[in-house]
């Protein structure tokens, strides 16, 4: 079995709260130790129309949690008649992770969404939860934070948030060998969830 730190290598995820919504961004490289084993892995997952999570860590563990969270969100909506709040989803994830801390899911998560306003939470591997205006996770997080700390501003537009998130990921790509290949950016506003990648993302950055 790979050492825990080795399994957690790879990826950089970023989240920002903007005036009109939340921006999540991630690279698409997946690594196993020092080996690149996939170049087009999706690391941001839609949970509901106004909820998403970005995961850095073991791909299988993250996908297992995504399936569980989607099922819980669907059950909540069918029972209560409305979408789960961002805080409720983050708290549910934190409780699941804390309950399995002796046999942990190997991942660090950013939970973003829009209910009454845009919100972003960071949830660590054992269920520690923090709400903030911006956050990063993964092997390139130090490089991403160097950009976010200096350039993030409150009330920035979603378009500016996309540009800043991409800049933070690109700095990580240049400096962290476990971050690379493609980019996926997600925005969540009152109008819902939208993905940007490839040519569409390039157009947004002009």
Swiss-Prot record:
Its main location: cytoplasm. Residues 1-10 form a propeptide. Transmembrane segments: none annotated. GO terms for cellular component: cytoplasm; proteasome core complex, beta-subunit complex. InterPro entries: Ntn_hydrolases_N (IPR029055), Pept_T1A_Psome_bsu_arc (IPR019983), Pept_T1A_subB (IPR000243), Proteasome_bsu_CS (IPR016050), Proteasome_sua/b (IPR001353), Proteasome_suB-type (IPR023333). The active site is at residue 11. GO terms for molecular function: threonine-type endopeptidase activity. Keywords: Autocatalytic cleavage, Cytoplasm, Hydrolase, Protease, Proteasome, Threonine protease, Zymogen. PROSITE patterns: PROTEASOME_BETA_1, PROTEASOME_BETA_2. One of its GO terms (biological process) is proteasomal protein catabolic process. It comes from the Archaea. It is found in: Cytoplasm. Its EC number is 3.4.25.1. It catalyses: Cleavage of peptide bonds with very broad specificity. It is an enzyme of class 3 (hydrolase). Gene3D superfamilies: Glutamine Phosphoribosylpyrophosphate, subunit 1, domain 1. The formation of the proteasomal ATPase PAN-20S proteasome complex, via the docking of the C-termini of PAN into the intersubunit pockets in the alpha-rings, triggers opening of the gate for substrate entry. Interconversion between the open-gate and close-gate conformations leads to a dynamic regulation of the 20S proteasome proteolysis activity. NCBIfam families: arc_protsome_B (TIGR03634). Component of the proteasome core, a large protease complex with broad specificity involved in protein degradation. Belongs to the peptidase T1B family. The 20S proteasome core is composed of 14 alpha and 14 beta subunits that assemble into four stacked heptameric rings, resulting in a barrel-shaped structure. The two inner rings, each composed of seven catalytic beta subunits, are sandwiched by two outer rings, each composed of seven alpha subunits. The catalytic chamber with the active sites is on the inside of the barrel. Has a gated structure, the ends of the cylinder being occluded by the N-termini of the alpha-subunits. Is capped at one or both ends by the proteasome regulatory ATPase, PAN. This is Proteasome subunit beta 2. It comes from Pyrococcus furiosus (strain ATCC 43587 / DSM 3638 / JCM 8422 / Vc1). The gene is psmB2.
């Amino acid at each position: 079995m790979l050492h825990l730190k080795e399994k957690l290598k790879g990826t950089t995820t970023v989240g920002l709260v903007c005036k009109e919504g939340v921006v999540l961004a991630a690279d698409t490289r997946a690594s196993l130790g020092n080996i690149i084993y996939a170049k087009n892995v999706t690391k941001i997952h839609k949970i509901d129309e106004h909820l998403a999570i970005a995961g850095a860590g073991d791909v299988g563990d993250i996908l297992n949690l995504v399936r569980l969270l989607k099922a819980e969100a669907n059950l909540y909506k069918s029972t209560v008649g409305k979408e789960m709040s961002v805080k409720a989803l983050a708290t549910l994830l934190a409780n699941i992770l804390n309950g399995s801390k002796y046999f942990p899911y190997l991942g660090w998560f950013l939970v973003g969404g829009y209910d009454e306003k845009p919100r972003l939470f960071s949830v660590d591997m054992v269920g520690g939860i923090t709400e903030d205006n911006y956050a990063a996770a993964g092997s390139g997080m130090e490089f991403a934070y160097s950009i976010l700390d200096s350039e993030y501003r409150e009330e920035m537009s979603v378009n500016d948030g996309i540009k800043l998130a991409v800049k933070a990921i690109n700095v990580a790509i240049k400096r962290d060998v476990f971050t690379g290949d493609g980019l996926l950016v997600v925005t969540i506003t009152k109008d819902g969830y939208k993905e940007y990648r490839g040519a569409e993302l390039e157009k947004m950055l002009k």
